[in-house]
Amino acid sequence: MPGIKLTPRDSFDDAYRKFKRQSDRNLIVTEARARQHYETKTEKRKKEKIATRKKILKKLFMLRRYESRL
């Protein structure tokens, strides 16, 4: 659980912002959403395959974009 240190000057908005940033860094919300429903091994492999493909296409796009500037 993320813990934040507050000073007497911090408002509620500041405290909330710090807490939200800390929880985003620790991937708490992402992990909770992932654990909400059971994911079979085939679904995991399928997601990994899609993510890998996206990553490759992104690199290819960036490479082509860079080459067009030369």
Curated annotation (Swiss-Prot):
Pfam families according to UniProt: Ribosomal_S21
Sorted UniProt keywords: Ribonucleoprotein, Ribosomal protein
Protein name per Swiss-Prot or TrEMBL: Small ribosomal subunit protein bS21
Naturally occurring in which organism (per UniProt): Sulfurovum sp. (strain NBC37-1)
Record GO terms (molecular function): structural constituent of ribosome
Presence of keyword Ribonucleoprotein: yes
Gene giving rise to this polypeptide: rpsU
Superkingdom in the source lineage: Bacteria
GO cellular component: ribonucleoprotein complex; ribosome
Similarity-based family: Belongs to the bacterial ribosomal protein bS21 family.
Biological process annotations from GO: translation
Species lineage: Bacteria, Pseudomonadati, Campylobacterota, Epsilonproteobacteria, Campylobacterales
Matches recorded under InterPro entries: Ribosomal_bS21 (IPR001911), Ribosomal_bS21_sf (IPR038380)
